[in-house]
């Protein structure tokens, strides 16, 4: 086991373009926020190491493009993911309607036991909110996945969302240590330079 950390988890952020996936990642990894953020082209990732229950967890968080034309590119990134955060914009009904389609993508490409979390972002825009909290919560309950509303702009629940995901993955790993050891999905990830933080397509 690498002495620098006890766990290495690969997380994915998925959802429609413009819902704030990159802003959530920027807020969690760098505690910063940009009002104007260039759409992700393909895939970007950042790394943040956190402490939880006396364990050091390295989170490698992949930010995927929401545009339809990148769907086939990003499908390969579902493989080996331990947790997937599905993001919609609380001020954009269509982005919420498309959550079911994103869940279908998870079913198609990800591991059967992957941890999921539904996140309604931009909760600070209360005057423009069109997706009721109750509606989203009922949908998440129906799908059997946790739900949280966040604001990357003012940092509401951003830390909590990622930490809750890390905790749920850690609990799952602890309950099935044999399976976790038998399928080291993190081996190829460790081949990546750990200090690679810049976007692969920053232009």
Curated annotation (Swiss-Prot):
The protein's matches in InterPro entries, at most eight in alphabetical order, are given as:
P-loop_NTPase, Rab, Small_GTP-bd, Small_GTPase
Where is this chain primarily localised? membrane
The record lists GTP as bound by 15-23, 33-40, 63-67, 121-124, 151-153
Q: Which SMART domains match?
A: ARF, RAB, RAN, RAS, RHO
Its membrane topology: Lipid-anchor
Output the Gene Ontology cellular-component terms. Answer: plasma membrane
Tissues of expression:
Its expression is weak in stems, higher in roots, leaves and coleoptiles, but highest in flowers.
Sequence motif Effector region, residues: 37-45
Entry GO MF terms: GTP binding; GTPase activity
Q: Where is the lipid attached (S-geranylgeranyl cysteine)?
A: 200-201
The keyword Protein biosynthesis belongs to this UniProt entry's keyword annotation:
no
Kindly indicate whether the keyword Nucleotide-binding belongs to this entry: yes
> What are the entry keywords?
Cell membrane, GTP-binding, Lipoprotein, Membrane, Nucleotide-binding, Prenylation, Protein transport, Transport
Q: Quote the subcellular location field of this record.
A: Cell membrane
Q: Which domain of life is it from?
A: Eukaryota
**Gene Ontology annotations of biological process type:** protein transport; vesicle-mediated transport
Its annotated function is as follows: Protein transport. Probably involved in vesicular traffic.
For this chain, the family text in UniProt reads: Belongs to the small GTPase superfamily. Rab family.
**Protein name listed in UniProt:** GTP-binding protein YPTM2
Question: Which source organism?
Answer: Zea mays
Gene that specifies this protein = YPTM2
């Amino acid at each position: 086991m690498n002495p620098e950390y006890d766990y290495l988890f690969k997380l994915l952020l998925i959802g429609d373009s413009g819902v704030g996936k990159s802003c959530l990642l920027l807020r969690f990894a760098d505690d910063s926020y940009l009002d104007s953020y260039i759409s992700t082209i393909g895939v970007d990732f950042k790394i943040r190491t956190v402490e939880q229950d006396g364990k050091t967890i390295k989170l490698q968080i992949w930010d995927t493009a929401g545009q339809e034309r990148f769907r086939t590119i990003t499908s390969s990134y579902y493989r080996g993911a331990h947790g997937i955060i599905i993001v919609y914009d609380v001020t954009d009904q269509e982005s919420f309607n498309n959550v079911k389609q994103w869940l279908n993508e998870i079913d198609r490409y990800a591991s059967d036991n992957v941890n999921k979390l539904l996140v309604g972002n931009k909760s600070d825009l209360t005057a423009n909110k069109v997706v009721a909290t109750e509606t989203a919560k009922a949908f998440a309950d129906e799908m059997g996945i946790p739900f949280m509303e966040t604001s990357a702009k003012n940092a509401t629940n951003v830390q909590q969302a990622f930490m809750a995901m890390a905790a749920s993955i850690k609990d799952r790993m602890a309950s099935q240590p044999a399976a976790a050891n038998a399928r080291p999905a993190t081996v190829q990830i460790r081949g990546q330079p750990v200090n690679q933080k810049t976007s692969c397509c920053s232009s």
